Regions:
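Conserved short beta-strand edge segments in small beta-sheet-based binding/regulatory domains
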Residues: 65-76
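Short glycine-/aliphatic-rich beta-strand segments at the starts of folded cytosolic domains
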Residues: 2-10
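Amphipathic, hydrophobic secondary-structure cores in small proteins
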Residues: 31-47
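Short amphipathic alpha-helix segments
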Residues: 11-26
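Short amphipathic alpha-helices in soluble, non-transmembrane regions
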Residues: 21, 56-62
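Single conserved hydrophobic/aromatic residue that forms the stacking wall/gate
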Residues: 78-85
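Helix N-cap motif at beta-to-alpha junctions
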Residues: 47-53
Length: 85
């Protein structure tokens, strides 16, 4: 399982990006959230298999009015919590 934090730039606000990405992610069994930012970008955090996340990103970029020009991605493969001594 992988968690990705992604910032999308381009024509990503006012074109149904959040709705379409939510629908696609849900259909692939992914979890997470997506929101518009004040600077015109969209921020997303998504969790699931690497293959499903890749499929979601491919499908988002195929949507009619969405034009992603840049994606900044941070991947998390596991989280380590500190233990009490």
């Amino acid at each position: 399982m992988v968690r990705k934090h992604i910032f999308f730039s381009g024509d990503v606000q006012g074109v149904g990006f959040r709705y379409r990405s939510f629908y696609i992610a849900q259909s692939l069994g992914l979890a997470g959230w997506v929101e518009n930012l004040w600077d015109g970008r969209v921020e997303m955090e998504v969790q699931g298999s690497e293959a499903s996340i890749r499929e979601m990103l491919d499908r988002i970029q195929q949507q009619r009015w969405i034009n992603v020009t840049d994606m900044e991605t941070v991947s998390y493969t596991h989280l380590t919590l500190p233990t009490k001594a």
